[in-house]
Regions:
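Structural microenvironment flanking redox-active thiols in thiol-disulfide oxidoreductases
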Residues: 59-123
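Thiol-/selenol-based redox modules, centered on thioredoxin-like
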Residues: 125-178
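Short pre-active-site segment immediately N-terminal to redox-active cysteine/selenocysteine motifs
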Residues: 46, 53-56, 84-87
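Positively charged n-region of N-terminal signal peptides that target proteins for export
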Residues: 1-4
Length: 178
């Protein structure tokens, strides 16, 4: 009996260690709007809020809430990643215009990608992965995905849910153990 319990305990511990080392999201690379790249592997162990954005949309004022989240939680580990996209025909013509618009109107300092396909055309691999593994595709601009510290999808929200909504803040705080 002692041997059975010991065997069970060792197996259980090994499974726990394997589970703890599992990271669900593959690494993705995004082009940085300022040049260079972002690699999501650099953010392992941190929650990442990924939001497809647009400069000429009724939801564009949500940039303010995204920046507030960045300002409040970045030092605790949260990454807020803005992913400008013209897939819904509401983005500026080029990355320089997007960056200028966001800086002038919203004083954006959070990480921002170059203009990226999220639903149509050459869809970015992150969004392909979300569609394939979680049956999720942005329905409109300012759709949000929260990736947890272990690469797990903690939640998805549409455009109507503001970044500062408790629906988003609660899982962010939980993932930061606040």
């Amino acid at each position: 009996m002692k041997r059975l319990i010991t065997t069970w305990f060792i197996t259980f511990c090994a499974a726990c260690v394997a589970w703890a080392d599992t990271y669900e999201m593959p690494g993705f690379t995004f082009s940085n709007i300022d040049g260079g790249e972002f690699n999501t592997d650099d953010w392992r162990g941190r929650p990442i809020l990924v939001v497809n954005t647009a400069s000429m949309c009724a939801f564009t004022p949500q940039y303010e809430g995204l920046q507030q989240l960045h300002d409040k939680y970045a030092d605790h580990g949260l990454v807020v990643l803005a992913v400008p996209s013209d897939d819904f025909n509401q983005e500026k013509d080029n990355a320089v215009e997007v960056k200028e618009f966001c800086t002038v109107n919203y004083d954006i300092t959070l990480p921002m990608t170059d203009i990226t396909h999220v639903k149509r055309g050459a869809v970015h691999p992150f969004y392909e992965w979300m569609n394939r593994t979680h049956n999720w595709t942005p329905r409109w601009n300012f759709s949000k995905v929260l990736i947890g510290p272990r690469g797990q999808v903690l939640g998805t929200w549409g455009s109507m849910v503001r970044p500062t909504s408790q629906k988003i803040i609660s899982p962010i705080q939980a993932s930061l153990a606040m």
